[in-house]
């Protein structure tokens, strides 16, 4: 771990703001996990109480025919059809996109989390609980399920900020943006004044966003760490872990966008070049992201080959 590389990165105010905002989202995710876990269980119990026939003794009869694909799901048995109806009844976006591909419908009678994933963004099929999800997945669940009684405008404002963080090609945000983000995330947290673990993170986020991180590069005989004006010490490895987690989430987001063809190949290529250039200049970060980077590059290469092949088919052969 190279302290001087970290100091150089945080010497860029806009990158430091990006890391601060991302760190807030990590804190938000952590404080929401227990609350979400309890509420998902409560929601599932409520569904079973309202429609007892959907309970643990109900069995999917459709087998593989009841397997959803992305946003498409046509149940082939009565149990899955009734579950789909109940999920849509509680879905705020019931007439829009529902990512059924996240779910294993056969588990809906017994597994509350499989039901919850129908209210979340794409790409979560392998997630087994809130502890494995990022902030936007948990925020989307709160926003999309009518079990959660909140001001949804406040939720969508934070989701929008998160997307701006992850879609920032150069991983930078301005101080003005950060102040606006602080207002929006605090407005959201104020919706949960009766949830102790969420209340507890409010002051931590406030301190984090209003302090000016002062990086201390220690001498050889000093302890290996970075001193912050908030009065606590974060080791180089802790800051490194925060950066890695944010960059990993960014690469995973880019992968999903590429897989769903939500971005043009040249846009993916440009963003990929920026990230590779950044990691090339920051070797202390690069090693922790090799697998995610290779996965994205491999998918991008497949798309490029397919695009070239399609273009070749469309080009008429010249006559000799």
From Swiss-Prot:
SS bonds (residue pairs): none
Keywords recorded for this protein, A-Z: Methylation, Phosphoprotein
Residue stretches of biased makeup (Basic and acidic residues): 307-320
Domain of life: Eukaryota
InterPro entries registered for this protein in UniProt: DUF4559
Region ranges (Disordered): 299-320
Post-translational modification Omega-N-methylarginine, affected residues: 61
Positions of modified residues (Phosphothreonine): 315
PANTHER family: RGD1565685 PROTEIN
Protein name (database record): Uncharacterized protein CXorf38 homolog
Organism, scientific name: Mus musculus
């Amino acid at each position: 771990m190279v302290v001087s590389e970290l100091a150089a990165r945080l010497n860029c105010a806009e990158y430091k703001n990006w890391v601060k905002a991302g760190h807030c989202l990590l804190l938000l995710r952590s404080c929401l996990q227990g609350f979400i876990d309890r509420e998902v269980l409560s929601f599932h119990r409520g569904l079973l109480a309202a429609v007892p026939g959907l309970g643990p003794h109900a069995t999917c009869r459709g087998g593989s025919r009841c397997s959803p694909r992305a946003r498409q799901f046509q149940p082939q048995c009565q149990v899955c059809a009734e579950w789909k109806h109940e999920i849509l009844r509680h879905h705020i976006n019931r007439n829009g996109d529902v990512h059924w591909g996240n779910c294993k419908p056969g588990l809906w009678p017994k597994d509350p989390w499989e039901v919850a994933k129908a209210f979340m963004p794409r790409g979560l099929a392998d997630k087994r609980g809130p502890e494995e999800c990022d902030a936007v997945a948990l925020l989307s669940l709160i926003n999309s399920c009518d079990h959660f009684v909140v001001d949804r405008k406040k939720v969508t404002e934070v989701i929008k900020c998160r997307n701006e963080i992850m879609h920032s090609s150069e991983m930078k945000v301005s101080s003005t943006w950060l102040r606006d983000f602080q207002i929006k995330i605090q407005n959201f947290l104020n919706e949960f004044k009766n949830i102790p673990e969420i209340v507890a993170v409010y002051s931590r986020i406030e301190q984090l966003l209003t302090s000016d991180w002062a990086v201390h590069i220690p001498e050889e005989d000093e302890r290996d760490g970075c001193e912050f004006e908030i009065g606590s010490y974060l080791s180089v490895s802790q800051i490194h872990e925060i950066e890695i987690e944010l960059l990993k989430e960014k690469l995973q987001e880019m992968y999903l966008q590429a897989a769903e063809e939500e971005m043009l190949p040249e846009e993916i290529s440009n963003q990929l070049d920026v990230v590779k250039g950044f990691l090339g200049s920051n070797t202390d970060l690069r090693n922790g992201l090799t697998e995610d980077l290779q996965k994205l590059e491999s998918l991008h290469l497949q798309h490029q080959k397919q695009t070239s092949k399609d273009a070749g088919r469309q080009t008429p052969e010249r006559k000799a």
